[in-house]
Amino acid sequence: TTMDKALLKEEYKRLLRQAVGDRTGSMALMMVLEEVDFYNCPASAKHHLNVPGGLLLHSLNVARTALELCEKMPQFAKCDTNAVLTAALLHDVCKTGKYIKKPDGGYQYRDTELLGHGEESVIRIQNWIHLTDKEILAIRWHMGAYTGERDWNTLSKVYDRCPEALCLHMADMIATHIMEVEK
Protein backbone atom coordinates (compact mmCIF):
# COMPACT_ATOMS: atom_id res chain seq x y z
CA THR A 1 0.00 0.00 0.00
CA THR A 2 0.96 3.66 -0.28
CA MET A 3 1.29 3.92 3.51
CA ASP A 4 3.55 0.88 3.67
CA LYS A 5 5.69 2.28 0.85
CA ALA A 6 5.99 5.61 2.68
CA LEU A 7 7.15 3.80 5.83
CA LEU A 8 9.65 1.73 3.83
CA LYS A 9 10.98 4.87 2.16
CA GLU A 10 11.42 6.57 5.54
CA GLU A 11 13.22 3.51 6.93
CA TYR A 12 15.50 3.41 3.89
CA LYS A 13 16.35 7.10 4.17
CA ARG A 14 16.99 6.77 7.92
CA LEU A 15 19.35 3.83 7.38
CA LEU A 16 21.12 5.58 4.51
CA ARG A 17 21.60 8.72 6.61
CA GLN A 18 22.96 6.51 9.40
CA ALA A 19 25.38 4.86 6.97
CA VAL A 20 26.61 7.81 4.86
CA GLY A 21 25.10 10.95 6.39
CA ASP A 22 28.39 12.61 7.28
CA ARG A 23 30.05 12.05 3.90
CA THR A 24 30.45 14.82 1.38
CA GLY A 25 27.73 14.48 -1.24
CA SER A 26 25.32 12.44 0.89
CA MET A 27 22.52 15.01 0.52
CA ALA A 28 23.05 15.08 -3.25
CA LEU A 29 22.85 11.28 -3.30
CA MET A 30 19.54 11.40 -1.40
CA MET A 31 18.13 13.89 -3.92
CA VAL A 32 19.35 11.84 -6.89
CA LEU A 33 17.62 8.73 -5.54
CA GLU A 34 14.36 10.70 -5.69
CA GLU A 35 15.10 12.03 -9.19
CA VAL A 36 15.97 8.64 -10.70
CA ASP A 37 12.83 7.15 -9.16
CA PHE A 38 14.74 4.63 -7.01
CA TYR A 39 11.79 4.35 -4.62
CA ASN A 40 9.31 3.33 -7.35
CA CYS A 41 11.42 0.98 -9.50
CA PRO A 42 10.83 -2.76 -9.49
CA ALA A 43 13.68 -4.97 -8.26
CA SER A 44 13.51 -7.19 -11.34
CA ALA A 45 11.61 -7.55 -14.58
CA LYS A 46 11.15 -11.32 -14.45
CA HIS A 47 11.92 -12.57 -10.98
CA HIS A 48 11.67 -11.07 -7.52
CA LEU A 49 9.56 -8.01 -6.64
CA ASN A 50 8.50 -7.10 -10.17
CA VAL A 51 6.29 -4.34 -8.74
CA PRO A 52 6.57 -0.58 -8.19
CA GLY A 53 8.71 -0.07 -5.09
CA GLY A 54 10.26 -3.52 -5.42
CA LEU A 55 13.81 -2.15 -5.54
CA LEU A 56 13.21 -0.22 -2.32
CA LEU A 57 11.87 -3.30 -0.53
CA HIS A 58 14.64 -5.51 -1.93
CA SER A 59 17.34 -3.07 -0.79
CA LEU A 60 15.84 -3.00 2.71
CA ASN A 61 15.54 -6.80 2.80
CA VAL A 62 19.20 -7.11 1.82
CA ALA A 63 20.27 -4.51 4.40
CA ARG A 64 18.30 -6.12 7.25
CA THR A 65 19.54 -9.58 6.32
CA ALA A 66 23.16 -8.47 5.99
CA LEU A 67 23.11 -6.82 9.42
CA GLU A 68 21.55 -9.96 10.90
CA LEU A 69 24.28 -12.11 9.32
CA CYS A 70 26.92 -9.81 10.88
CA GLU A 71 25.23 -10.16 14.26
CA LYS A 72 24.59 -13.91 14.25
CA MET A 73 27.30 -15.57 12.17
CA PRO A 74 30.81 -15.76 13.65
CA GLN A 75 32.28 -15.57 10.12
CA PHE A 76 30.92 -12.03 9.82
CA ALA A 77 31.43 -10.84 13.40
CA LYS A 78 34.41 -8.69 12.40
CA CYS A 79 32.73 -7.13 9.38
CA ASP A 80 32.57 -3.36 9.15
CA THR A 81 28.81 -3.11 9.65
CA ASN A 82 28.70 0.43 8.28
CA ALA A 83 30.32 -0.76 5.04
CA VAL A 84 27.89 -3.69 4.91
CA LEU A 85 24.90 -1.39 5.47
CA THR A 86 26.07 1.15 2.88
CA ALA A 87 26.73 -1.53 0.28
CA ALA A 88 23.44 -3.31 0.96
CA LEU A 89 21.38 -0.15 0.59
CA LEU A 90 23.10 0.94 -2.62
CA HIS A 91 24.13 -2.31 -4.36
CA ASP A 92 21.44 -2.14 -7.08
CA VAL A 93 21.37 1.64 -7.69
CA CYS A 94 22.24 1.08 -11.34
CA LYS A 95 18.85 -0.54 -11.96
CA THR A 96 17.12 2.84 -11.86
CA GLY A 97 15.91 4.19 -15.19
CA LYS A 98 16.10 0.81 -16.91
CA TYR A 99 12.57 -0.51 -16.49
CA ILE A 100 9.85 0.10 -19.04
CA LYS A 101 6.26 -0.50 -17.96
CA LYS A 102 4.48 -2.99 -20.24
CA PRO A 103 0.76 -2.85 -21.13
CA ASP A 104 0.13 -5.93 -18.96
CA GLY A 105 1.43 -4.03 -15.91
CA GLY A 106 4.75 -5.87 -15.73
CA TYR A 107 8.16 -4.47 -16.61
CA GLN A 108 10.76 -4.93 -19.30
CA TYR A 109 14.42 -4.40 -18.35
CA ARG A 110 16.49 -2.40 -20.82
CA ASP A 111 20.22 -2.33 -20.08
CA THR A 112 22.51 -0.69 -22.62
CA GLU A 113 25.58 -0.51 -20.37
CA LEU A 114 28.71 -2.51 -21.10
CA LEU A 115 29.52 -3.11 -17.45
CA GLY A 116 28.10 -5.56 -14.97
CA HIS A 117 25.66 -4.00 -12.58
CA GLY A 118 28.08 -4.24 -9.65
CA GLU A 119 30.61 -2.08 -11.46
CA GLU A 120 27.96 0.26 -12.78
CA SER A 121 26.48 0.81 -9.32
CA VAL A 122 29.94 1.60 -7.89
CA ILE A 123 30.61 4.15 -10.63
CA ARG A 124 27.20 5.81 -10.32
CA ILE A 125 27.35 6.04 -6.51
CA GLN A 126 30.82 7.59 -6.62
CA ASN A 127 29.43 10.45 -8.68
CA TRP A 128 28.00 11.64 -5.34
CA ILE A 129 29.81 10.05 -2.41
CA HIS A 130 33.16 8.41 -1.79
CA LEU A 131 32.92 4.67 -1.16
CA THR A 132 35.43 2.82 1.02
CA ASP A 133 37.42 -0.05 -0.46
CA LYS A 134 35.23 -2.55 1.42
CA GLU A 135 32.06 -0.94 0.06
CA ILE A 136 33.46 -0.96 -3.48
CA LEU A 137 34.40 -4.64 -3.26
CA ALA A 138 31.07 -5.62 -1.69
CA ILE A 139 29.00 -3.82 -4.32
CA ARG A 140 31.22 -4.91 -7.22
CA TRP A 141 31.12 -8.59 -6.21
CA HIS A 142 27.59 -8.87 -4.79
CA MET A 143 26.50 -11.02 -7.74
CA GLY A 144 28.96 -13.72 -6.71
CA ALA A 145 29.50 -16.46 -9.27
CA TYR A 146 26.67 -15.03 -11.39
CA THR A 147 29.21 -12.62 -12.90
CA GLY A 148 30.66 -15.49 -14.93
CA GLU A 149 33.29 -18.18 -14.80
CA ARG A 150 36.12 -15.81 -15.78
CA ASP A 151 35.73 -14.10 -12.38
CA TRP A 152 35.70 -17.18 -10.14
CA ASN A 153 39.40 -17.08 -9.13
CA THR A 154 39.20 -13.42 -8.22
CA LEU A 155 35.86 -13.88 -6.46
CA SER A 156 37.34 -16.42 -4.07
CA LYS A 157 40.20 -14.04 -3.22
CA VAL A 158 37.76 -11.16 -2.69
CA TYR A 159 35.63 -13.20 -0.28
CA ASP A 160 38.76 -14.30 1.63
CA ARG A 161 40.00 -10.73 2.03
CA CYS A 162 36.70 -8.88 2.33
CA PRO A 163 34.04 -10.72 4.36
CA GLU A 164 31.75 -7.74 3.76
CA ALA A 165 31.52 -8.77 0.09
CA LEU A 166 30.53 -12.34 0.96
CA CYS A 167 28.05 -11.08 3.55
CA LEU A 168 26.37 -8.82 0.98
CA HIS A 169 26.25 -11.61 -1.60
CA MET A 170 24.66 -14.01 0.89
CA ALA A 171 22.14 -11.39 2.05
CA ASP A 172 21.23 -10.61 -1.57
CA MET A 173 20.70 -14.31 -2.32
CA ILE A 174 18.60 -14.84 0.83
CA ALA A 175 16.45 -11.82 0.00
CA THR A 176 16.07 -12.72 -3.67
CA HIS A 177 15.60 -16.48 -3.49
CA ILE A 178 13.95 -16.96 -0.09
CA MET A 179 12.29 -13.81 1.26
CA GLU A 180 10.99 -12.39 -2.02
CA VAL A 181 9.77 -15.55 -3.72
CA GLU A 182 6.04 -15.52 -4.39
CA LYS A 183 4.32 -18.50 -2.88
Residue ranges and their predicted role:
Residues 1-102, 152:
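Acidic/His-rich, divalent-metal-binding segments that scaffold phosphate/diphosphate chemistry
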Residues 56-63, 114-118, 164:
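Short alpha-helical patches at coil-to-helix transitions and adjacent helical residues
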Residues 73, 106, 146-147:
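A short hydrophobic/aromatic micro-motif that marks alpha-helical segments and, especially, helix-coil
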Residues 4, 8-12, 22-28, 117, ...:
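Alpha-helical structural motif
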Residues 49-53, 112, 158-161:
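Short, solvent-exposed segments of well-ordered alpha helices
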Residues 82, 94-130:
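A contiguous pocket-lining binding segment that forms or flanks enzyme active sites
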Residues 84-85, 122, 126, 130-183:
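Histidine/acidic-rich helix-loop-helix segments that form or flank divalent-metal centers
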